[in-house]
């Protein structure tokens, strides 16, 4: 769920507050549209697509609880998750790891969505 995703982000990117990822580019935060502005925004586009796929499996990604572990910046999804829990955990884990490897460009935070995301 979104609370767990926030905690996963904190695990892989402890140096930056999670809310910096909630209004970034064209895909991080609100619904996505247009061309991603950079690699970090592409992480969010992939995450959106992953949640969409989980939704088509009958899951509710924003609310699905799952079990995971964070140890020294490394995430693992627990083996005992339900089908939906495993799917959503994997979506969030992949995104949090992607965030850790992508450059954060301050100019792409809180952009003019209507102008830049067509």
From Swiss-Prot:
Residues holding Ca(2+): 27, 29, 31, 48
Subcellular compartments: Secreted
Principal location class: secreted
Note on cofactor: Binds 1 Ca(2+) ion.
Catalytic-site annotation from UniProt: 47, 92
Catalysed reactions listed for this entry: a 1,2-diacyl-sn-glycero-3-phosphocholine + H2O = a 1-acyl-sn-glycero-3-phosphocholine + a fatty acid + H(+)
GO molecular function, one term: calcium ion binding
Cellular component annotations (GO), alphabetically ordered: extracellular region
Keyword Calcium: yes
The protein's Enzyme Commission number: 3.1.1.4
Keyword Metal-binding: yes
Keywords: Blood coagulation cascade inhibiting toxin, Calcium, Cytolysis, Disulfide bond, Hemolysis, Hemostasis impairing toxin, Hydrolase, Lipid degradation, Lipid metabolism, Metal-binding, Myotoxin, Neurotoxin, Secreted, Toxin
Cofactor(s) listed in the protein's UniProt record: Ca(2+)
GO BP: arachidonate secretion; killing of cells of another organism; lipid catabolic process; phospholipid metabolic process
InterPro entries: PLipase_A2 (IPR001211), PLipase_A2_Asp_AS (IPR033112), PLipase_A2_dom (IPR016090), PLipase_A2_dom_sf (IPR036444), PLipase_A2_His_AS (IPR033113)
Residues spanned by motif Coagulation factor Xa binding motif: 52-69
Tissues expressed in: Expressed by the venom gland.
Disulfide bonds: 11-70, 26-117, 28-44, 43-98, 50-91, 59-84, 77-89
Protein family (similarity comment): Belongs to the phospholipase A2 family. Group I subfamily. D49 sub-subfamily.
Described purpose of this protein according to its UniProt entry: Snake venom phospholipase A2 (PLA2) that shows several activities. It shows strong anticoagulant activity, probably by binding to coagulation factor Xa (F10) and inhibiting the formation of the prothrombinase complex, shows direct hemolytic action, causes neuromuscular blockade with a gradual contracture and a decreased sensitivity to ACh and KCl, abolishes twitches evoked by indirect stimulation earlier than those by direct stimulation (in the mouse phrenic nerve-diaphragm preparation), and causes myonecrosis when injected intramuscularly.
Protein name (database record): Basic phospholipase A2 CM-III
Gene source species: Naja mossambica
